[in-house]
Regions:
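Gly/Pro-rich active-site loop or hairpin
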Residues: 36, 191-207, 226-291
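Conserved, mostly hydrophobic/aromatic
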Residues: 18, 26, 102, 183, ...
Length: 299
């Protein structure tokens, strides 16, 4: 277990800063658009990271946390979650190709999201030292917000689309020995919000997710902050959830984030002031033998 970052380097000097701050491992973002990724330019990117005495632990697949409407405009993959064929089959084929290229380029893991409505938040609130805190208050959210490009997506439909994706992608990951780390839905929202029932927004949903296409290379980008946002009493509940997924070796990356509050009403805060005892959390990650990055994010 070690500290890492997923902060996207703005210039080459940021890589130097990472090293100066004691960060040795990163989740990277190749500089070439994903449509143009090749084994050669992925190797070049990894070697560039390594030239700063850093290790490239994983890269982000073109399945981000952005809402699907934004991805439609930007050209990022979205049909995997609309279920439209043959377009989704092309996207899945490209994801499989990227996994193969990462393996050949010496990149051991990838992270991704299966997100339709993005990361809902309400108005920011002020925190320590005047910091603006990312906030979600369900009682202040627009409960009548319109559906996304994806339209109505029920629980059963969402699971069907996830299963379709995993059935094709997980065997490729296993064959190429590349870990797939999926981020939960941030935050939990009541069923039908913006037309979607978010199946990866509960602990039970995450348990079901890892049981689909059970495989050593199929697991979670375990965002501790997001998981605590699913809980009524996160300060007590989170540790057993870490144990559950950690003992199954399903945690491939940790977003080491804290919140103040609980399900449907919280702010993201500095690590030392939230509802979770972060020192105790680290001890649990050690207890279960977690061996990858702890990334401080959203601060």
């Amino acid at each position: 277990m070690y500290l890492g970052t997923q902060f996207a380097a703005r210039t080459d000097s940021d890589y130097e800063t990472f090293k100066q701050l004691g960060v040795n491992n990163i989740n990277g973002f190749p500089e070439t658009p994903h449509q143009n990724w090749t084994v050669e330019n992925l190797i070049q990117y990894r070697e560039k990271v390594e030239s700063y005495d850093l290790k490239l632990d994983m890269v982000q697949l073109p399945l981000s946390s952005k809402d699907i409407d934004s991805r439609v405009k930007s050209g990022e993959f979205y049909n995997i979650l609309t279920g439209i064929s043959p377009e989704r089959d092309y996207e899945i084929e490209r994801i499989c190709k990227i996994i193969e290229m990462c393996s050949k380029a010496g990149i051991p893991a990838v992270k991704y999201n299966l997100n339709i409505i993005g990361i809902p938040r309400t108005e920011s609130e002020s925190g320590r030292g005047g910091a603006k805190l990312s906030t979600f208050r369900w009682d202040k959210a627009d409960h009548d917000a319109k559906d996304t490009y994806a339209g109505k997506v029920s629980e059963d439909v969402f699971w069907e689309r996830i299963d379709y994706f995993l059935e094709k992608v997980v065997p490729v990951a296993e064959e190429n020995k590349v870990r797939l780390a999926c981020h939960p839905h941030d935050p939990y929202t009541p069923p039908g919000y913006k037309g979607v029932t978010r199946v990866l927004g509960t602990v039970e949903g995450l348990k079901k997710f890892i049981s689909i296409q059970e495989n050593d290379y199929h697991g979670l980008n375990f965002c501790q902050g997001t998981v605590t946002e699913m809980m009524d009493n996160p300060g007590e509940e989170i540790f057993d959830v870490i144990r559950y997924f950690g003992n199954k070796d399903k945690i491939f990356n940790v977003h080491f984030r804290n919140i103040k509050g609980s399900k449907l009403s919280f702010t993201e805060v500095f690590p030392d002031e939230g509802s979770i005892n972060m020192y105790e959390a680290i001890k649990v990650y050690k207890e279960v033998g977690y061996k990858y990055m702890l990334s401080l994010i959203h601060i």
